[in-house]
Every structure is written in structure tokens, then in C-alpha cells.
Amino acid sequence: REEAEIPSKIVIFIDELNKYGSKDVPKNSPILRQLLDITERGRSLGIILFAAEQFKSDIHDRVKGNCATHAYGRTNAIEISKPDYQFVPPVYKSMLTRLKQGEYILQNPVFRSLLNIKFPRPLYKQFKNG
């Protein structure tokens, strides 16, 4: 390929990250090695990783440590009692157990506090007679 044909940014989406980037995955796993490389060097290479998982506490520390933005959906009290959530103020911990579908709490170093966001309902669900 010629340089002009290579995209300047590559976006990778991974669902169920805990299957591939868990603390329990063997250290010699080729998928884990690639994930660590992407999370540790990806930004400088123009690679953006979006990952989703049910339990942040299960994810490898080096993967979590290189994530700038975290979006938290509804979770349970057992999960928020883990050390990964020790920085979360009690009011937000309480919110995390009661979030509705489409509601998230965002954490990013740019913001001084956590943000509660709500995605709008799809247009076809907003009206009874559609």
C-alpha cells in the first residue's frame, strides 16, 4: 500500500473485553499481548480502542491503566465494592446501582468530577403512535 492509502486513525471496537484482556488470561496469550501493545502504544500510532465489559475489576491492570476515558453503566454492589471503584464518591456508587438503560457515568481527566449522561431514547420509541 502507498502511504496515502493508509488511514491516519484506526478505531477498534471490542465487546466483552474481559474474555481477551482479563487478569486471568495467560500472560503468553497472543491476544493479550496485542491488547497491551494497543493500549500502551496505540495513541502514538493513531489507534483508538473502544472496549466494553461487564466488570471493570476483571480487566488486566495495564489495560485499565492506559485508558483515559471510562464510561460506567449500571452495575451491582459487589462490583462497586472492588478496589477499582475506591475513587468513586459514595453518591456516584449509589447511582451506579440504579442507572437506567441509556444512562452512564463518565470519567475523564479533562473533567473535574464524574459526569452523569443520558442518551436520548430512539425517535421511534418517543411517541406512542409512532
Describe each model-derived feature in a short phrase.
Residues 101-130:
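Conserved P-loop NTPase motor module
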